[in-house]
Amino acid sequence: MEPKQRVVKPLKERVLPVVKNTQFVWFSGQVIVLISSVLYALQAIPFRSAPPFLFKSAAFGAIVAYAIVLYKTYSPNLTSRASWNKHFFARLMLDDNVQYFILALSMLIDRPILFSLAPYAIYATFHISTYLRSVLLPAIYPNISDAKTASYASRVSNLLNQYTRSQFQPAMQLVASLETFLLFRLFFGVFLRKNSISRLVGYIFFLRMRYTNSHFTRASIKAVSLRMDRLVADNRVPPVIKNAWHTFKTYVSKFGASPVGTAQSRPTASSSTTAPSST
């Protein structure tokens, strides 16, 4: 008796359910983040000017992607007011996805700053890679007897998996360094009138949460702080800058030492490569 051959659905029937899923909207948001960030950087870095809509587009893509993750995570709590307690709000405050969602909202409103897009773009490369490997490739190239197709899909999947595994930790270190750099960019931007002090304060709150959740951020802040101490110690630095730096450092140190709760029940972090669950 001949083995029964597996019936493979047409490509449209395989892909259409994927496109209709909210995961695909999340994926589309990540693609918008990556493409818009790259296009903005390609113009802003060499020419020091780029269309603001590219920056806003990247921020919008991030808002869409993180909004879906937050809805998937917290929608059961939203339907029951009994769950709106201090533990729920502490969980919200410590959730990386909430922090990046709020930061993206502020980026949509505020003046563009080039490097503020970089962490979102780096995260997007891993999110896109994981989604392609776990969702899109299996839909486009199902496990059929066509050796060439299976081999091609397998090679692409292996490359994506290898990229995720080998580059994840270095990428998180880079993200932490960029986010720490942005803190000092905003600090000096207040003196140069390139950004408001309210934006700096808001970002300090964001980085305070990152300091709690990420050992990469803690290591980065410590390293950059030591470098800044050496730079400010130079006799050529005006006393007003030295005093401002020491005051700022003291304030941030006290703020960073204040308790913000525990991260025991925190949901999946934004830096995770896991896509939101399907519906």
Curated annotation (Swiss-Prot):
Pfam families: TMEM33_Pom33 (PF03661). Glycans are attached at N77, N143. Keywords: Cell cycle, Cell division, Endoplasmic reticulum, Glycoprotein, Golgi apparatus, Membrane, Nucleus, Transmembrane, Transmembrane helix. InterPro entries: PER33/POM33_regulator, TMEM33/Pom33. GO terms for biological process: cell division; endoplasmic reticulum tubular network membrane organization; endoplasmic reticulum tubular network organization; membrane organization; mitotic spindle pole body insertion into the nuclear envelope; mitotic spindle pole body localization; nuclear membrane organization. GO terms for cellular component: cell division site; cortical endoplasmic reticulum; endoplasmic reticulum; endoplasmic reticulum membrane; endoplasmic reticulum tubular network; Golgi apparatus; Golgi membrane; nuclear envelope. The chain crosses the membrane at residues 25-45, 50-70, 100-122, 172-192. It is a multi-pass membrane protein. Residues 262-279 have a biased composition (Low complexity). It is found in: Golgi apparatus membrane; Endoplasmic reticulum membrane; Nucleus membrane. Required for the correct positioning of the cellular division plane by delimiting the actomyosin ring assembly at the cell equator. Interacts with RTN1 and YOP1. Belongs to the PER33/POM33 family. This is Tetra-spanning protein 1. It comes from Schizosaccharomyces pombe (strain 972 / ATCC 24843).
